[in-house]
Curated annotation (Swiss-Prot):
Record HAMAP family: NadE_ammonia_dep
Catalysed transformations (reactions): deamido-NAD(+) + NH4(+) + ATP = AMP + diphosphate + NAD(+) + H(+)
One biological process term in Gene Ontology: NAD biosynthetic process
InterPro entries membership: NAD/GMP_synthase, NAD_synthase, NH(3)-dep_NAD(+)_synth, Rossmann-like_a/b/a_fold
Keyword set includes tRNA-binding: no
Keyword vocabulary terms for this entry: ATP-binding, Ligase, Magnesium, Metal-binding, NAD, Nucleotide-binding
Residues binding ATP: G46, I47, S48, G49, G50, Q51, D52, S53, T160, K189, T211
UniProt name for this protein: NH(3)-dependent NAD(+) synthetase
Cystine pairings recorded for this chain: none
Species this protein is from: Listeria welshimeri serovar 6b (strain ATCC 35897 / DSM 20650 / CCUG 15529 / CIP 8149 / NCTC 11857 / SLCC 5334 / V8)
E.C. designation(s): 6.3.1.5
Function noted in UniProt: Catalyzes the ATP-dependent amidation of deamido-NAD to form NAD. Uses ammonia as a nitrogen source.
Length: 274
């Protein structure tokens, strides 16, 4: 039980929430960051068409719109970036998500040429990437592009990581995990759905099965299959509810196994890994 106490303390998930209050909490958090760092003028976010980027994008646009209204400074902008590898299977969902969040700016950068070039260069050097490793290349290329856009617009990269994802470390280190600010952390998956429902999001965007969709050989592989545990079980665990012993063990194993992802590069003074 000690490990669960630690996880619950780290993940900060409330047993119940008020969706409207949590929306305002995230928006005010994003605005406060811009107000504190007055040299920053934009948010940049990669949009997949899934629940997490849809919610994060809507919150980011709300924050930017309010900053413009409050300051009269039209330099405040939100950049929603589509980053397909070739053709995305659920492109229609991404377009629905973009229409829902109505971002100031829509950009599309196809990462296929860049990823394939990296894979080919590594192969030429004698390093043949597995399909899984190539999937991580895609995630890191997407983040590289977002930071390039942010650099040109006085921006920061907004992350989609929430507590149900953070507890399992279900993201690529220095890929989708390598962001500047994460307005969803403290929420689990079902709570994110509640916020989207409150915001009037089309329900198919938050009822679809979550997938990282990184592997060529396993297209649209559901997160729950990859993790071996359901989001309902993860959410129950984070809310302090009873879950099957095998599910709890899997969640705790993921937490321990991926702890390095929740830290910057370790130094001689760090002891979490010992």
């Amino acid at each position: 039980m000690e490990i669960r106490k630690r996880i619950l303390a780290d993940m900060q998930v409330a047993e119940t929430i008020d969706a409207h209050e949590e929306i305002r909490k995230s928006v005010e958090f994003l605005k406060a960051y811009l107000k504190k760092n007055t040299f920053l003028k934009s948010f940049v976010l990669g949009i997949s068409g899934g629940q997490d980027s849809t919610l994060t994008g809507k919150l980011a646009q709300l924050a930017i719109s309010e900053m413009r209204d409050e300051t009269g400074d039209n330099e405040y902008q939100f950049f929603a970036v589509s980053l397909p590898y070739g053709t995305q299977l659920d492109e229609s969902d991404r377009q629905d998500a973009l229409n829902f969040m109505n971002p100031d700016n829509r950009l599309t950068v196809n990462i296929k040429a860049s990823v394939d070039a990296s894979v080919a260069a590594l192969a030429e050097a004698g390093v043949e990437l597995s399909d899984f490793a190539k999937g991580n290349e895609k995630a890191r290329e997407r983040m590289k592009v977002q930071y390039a856009i942010a650099a040109m617009h006085k921006g920061v990269v907004v992350g989609t990581d929430h507590s149900a994802e953070a507890v399992t470390g279900f993201y690529t280190k220095y890929g989708d995990g390598g962001t500047d600010i994460n307005p969803l952390f403290r929420l689990n998956k079902r709570q994110g759905k509640a916020l989207l429902k409150e915001l009037g999001c089309p329900e198919h965007l938050y009822l679809k099965k979550p997938t990282a969709d990184l592997e060529d050989n396993k297209p649209a592989l559901p997160d729950e299959v990859a993790l071996g545990v359901t989001y309902d079980q993860i959410d129950d665990y984070l809310e302090g509810k009873e879950v099957p012993a095998d599910a709890a063990a899997k969640i705790e194993n993921w937490f321990i196994k991926t702890e390095h992802k929740r830290h910057m590069a370790i130094t001689i003074f760090d002891d979490f890994w010992k």
